Amino acid sequence: MQFSVVIPTYNRAGELKETLASLAKITNAGTWEVIVVDNNSADATRRVVVDAAANFPVELRYLIERQVGRSAALNTGIKAAAGEIIATTDDDVRFEPDWLQQAAEALEREQCDFVGGKVVPIWGGPKPAWLSDKGGRHWAVIALLDFGPEPVEFGKRYAPLGVNLAFKREAFDRSGLWDPGIGRKAGTLLGQEVREWMLRARDAGLRGMYAPKMVVHHVIPEDRLQKRYFRRWFYWHGVSRAMLYQQHPIDMHAPEETSIDFSKVHLVFGVPRYMYRSCFGSAIAMVKAGFDGEEVACFEHELALWFFLGVLRQRWRDRNRPPGAGKDSGKFVGATA
């Protein structure tokens, strides 16, 4: 089998129904299957999958993963997958008909181990004036991504989104599955599971590329187009980055940066001192942008402060544990066998 598409889901039966309807229109994909992994939903998720499977163009499977978290659900789907290429996405996505074809062509053309594509919005409400049209840190909150019309290698400046990824099967054999201790869980906005996996992939010698023609459309609900949601997301982003720092000594701002001598990084309350300088700079820039009437820049600098608060909170909790002390690859390495 050429492709397996893995969709983790939790209590979003309505969105999942539309996602599966869109996925059913995929063309030129050769042999493929879809695996929906229910992460303890209490709604009609199972019924939606069973009903869709009756007329789906390929095999559509329903699995349950009781361990809470997106990473655990993805691992269950990956272990069950039969495809040589394993694509992962979300339950609130619409697909270009050639999505899988573009993934396969990019993997072959770039001779890489995984690819991530463009993510464009389906707005569920008016786009706010403070949300940049040009990408940047704001876009990560609502899982949008556009690195331009040309392929670029993932690394220091570029990272994919979990909503639009495809892997050669052996990539998981070499670098392991997702870490179930990191990533989204019900009731939180934890993340960084893709970043954590990419660090291990880099250490295993894997390469990933941005594939601009591999496109999905992501539904952005109106309640996520509010400043309070962005503030909450960036706070949890800081918590997540600090958790990643606990496992892998990294640059808090650029996890893939490898030039830092961590023996010379001074910590204050468990947080690298350079982050305090960055926080102070963001505060000054926020005030200046506010006075200048630059709404987008002002809010972007404010979000950097929420990120810092999340880092500070988590590092205070981990203050008696040195960076790297949380690393335990045994619980998530060992992939598809």
Provide a role label for each language-model segment.
Residues 12-25:
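Short, well-formed alpha-helical segments that are part of the catalytic scaffolds
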Residues 65-81:
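Glycine-rich, basic loop-to-helix element that forms the pyrophosphate-binding segment
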Residues 162-167, 171-176, 181-214:
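A short, conserved alpha-helix in the catalytic core of glycosyltransferases
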Residues 134-158:
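Short, flexible, basic/aromatic active-site loop/helix in glycosyltransferases
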Residues 98-132:
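Conserved donor NDP-sugar-binding/catalytic core segment of glycosyltransferases
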Residues 86:
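Short aromatic/hydrophobic "clamp" motif used to bind/position activated sugar donors
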Residues 233-236, 250-337:
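Non-catalytic, C-terminal membrane-associated alpha-helical segments of glycosyltransferases
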